[in-house]
Amino acid sequence: MENKIEVNNKDEMNKWFEEFKKGNGLVDTFTNPYSFCESVPNLERFVFQMASATDDAQKDSIYASALVEATKFCAPIYECAWVSSTGIVKKGLEWFEKNAGTIKSWDESYIELKVEVPKIEQLANYQQAALKWRKDIGFRVNANTAALSHKVLAEYKVPGEIVMSVKEMLSDMIRRRNLILNRGGDENPRGPVSREHVEWCREFVKGKYIMAFNPPWGDINKSGRSGIALVATGLAKLAETEGKGVFDEAKKTVEALNGYLDKHKDEVDKASADNMITNLLKHIAKAQELYKNSSALRAQGAQIDTAFSSYYWLYKAGVTPETFPTVSQFLFELGKQPRGTKKMKKALLSTPMKWGKKLYELFADDSFQQNRIYMHPAVLTAGRISEMGVCFGTIPVANPDDAAQGSGHTKSILNLRTNTETNNPCAKTIVKLFEIQKTGFNIQDMDIVASEHLLHQSLVGKQSPFQNAYNVKGNATSANII
């Protein structure tokens, strides 16, 4: 077997794709870039099947079947071909050999990370490595393979018939987020943070230093129920949505305030002024500490960069450019028929290729007891095989034309359009998956609700599985659903 997508740069990619498009019925009616999707997937039958299911194994199987049906034909073909092309495969794998130091903090702790929640530094280092990998190998070929840095969507337009369902999903996402922010894993649980306090901090860091004289809660040193100064909790919360740059801005504001007080020293009580400056700097330092240990930052750092993690798993499994086509074929077949975890693991162990057993050995331990939203994004699980699938299994590289048969992998759903002209098929499909899950399971008992995670990805503005959203600013659950 050999990789038939012999491409090393964008010009060669464009040429390959034009040839491929001539012989295959690619369309872009319902998807962003071209795909094999000719109609919006109809998942209604899975709701009825789920309603009559009697055990969890049966329910899991039904949901897996619905996922394959939903995503079988909607992957972005151009981008999938690029991710699996000979040039990217070669550079993508070689990068890990040359950058052992870059991935050291989490790669050397892989065994521990299979069973334990990662340290904040291990998450931050993963995200830095992912961005470096993208830059070093020239991964970006268009906007659909870019590292995003915009703000989350302010508005998300959906058809009238699903508005209430999307709002229900958002409400559950907010409930989970509040549980995490107010309780889950912070070394200093700070309690809820008032929007009024955050807004005050937002204005303060813009340079409005006179506001320090009279904050809405009274004394600048006043603490909340947690015993932590309200300035500190407000700044930490602001940093979660605006980025850690707010701390530098806050320090500049304090410098400006100090300059003002010094300039008007004849009208200022020196002891009080010095005390205010000292305390403000102390509150900023506390805010930085809270931010560093925050569950929100942890959840942000745990976001998977689909392409980067998938290449890391190939590298760890000893896959080479020569054996890559066998992995591609395996994942293509995996996406044609839904398989439960047991069957998928058995398939990996049954392949004569060494990478099968090695991928199996990379799987997270079943004894991982924490909330799985915190699991390190470089740790492979049975569910995350789908991340590899969308990268390498959409197009079997030894026989690219076979892609027309369809191969379903979860993140392909992000390629469905979100515009109103097409009635937002992305949201409609995600909502139907949520309805299927809700019919079979108690949503509130689940650590991660897969359909809600997909909605979150859409709300942060992802329109492709291959975009990195680590630097997207803002809170996705604040979007106005209209």
Curated annotation (Swiss-Prot):
Q: Supply the alphabetized keyword list.
A: Capsid protein, Helical capsid protein, Ribonucleoprotein, RNA-binding, Viral nucleoprotein, Virion
Per the annotation, the residue ranges of the short sequence motif DEVD are: 266-269
As to how many cofactors bind and how, the note says:
Endonuclease activity is stimulated by divalent cations such as Mn2+, Co2+, and Mg2+.
Note the site residues: Homooligomerization: 213, 267-268, 276, 352
What does this protein need as cofactor?
Answer: Mn(2+)
After translation, how is this protein modified?
Answer: Cleaved at the DQVD motif by host CASP3/caspase 3 in mammalian cells at 48 hours postinfection giving rise to cleavage products of about 30 kDa and 22 kDa that remain associated. Only the monomeric form is cleaved. Little or no cleavage in tick cells. Caspase cleavage reduces the viral polymerase activity. Caspase cleavage is not required for productive infection in mammalian or tick host cells.
Q: Where is this site: Cleavage by host CASP3/caspase 3?
A: 269-270
**UniProt-listed Pfam families:** Nairo_nucleo
Subcellular location, in the record's words? Answer: Virion
- Assembly, per entry: Probable homooligomer; forms a double superhelical polymer. Monomer.
Its function, per the record, reads: Binds dsRNA and ssRNA and probably participates in the packaging of viral genome. In the dsRNA binding mode, the nucleocapsid protein specifically binds to the vRNA panhandle secondary structure formed at the termini of viral genome. Does not discriminate between viral and nonviral RNAs through ssRNA binding mode. Displays dsDNA endonuclease activity that is sequence non-specific.
Q: Which family does it belong to?
A: Belongs to the nairovirus nucleocapsid protein family.
The record comments on the domains as follows:
The DQVD motif is a CASP3/caspase 3 cleavage site essential for viral replication in host cell. However, the importance for viral replication is apprently not linked to caspase cleavage. This motif is involved in homooligomerization.
The protein depicted here goes by the name Nucleoprotein
Q: What is the protein's species of origin?
A: Crimean-Congo hemorrhagic fever virus (isolate C68031) (CCHFV)
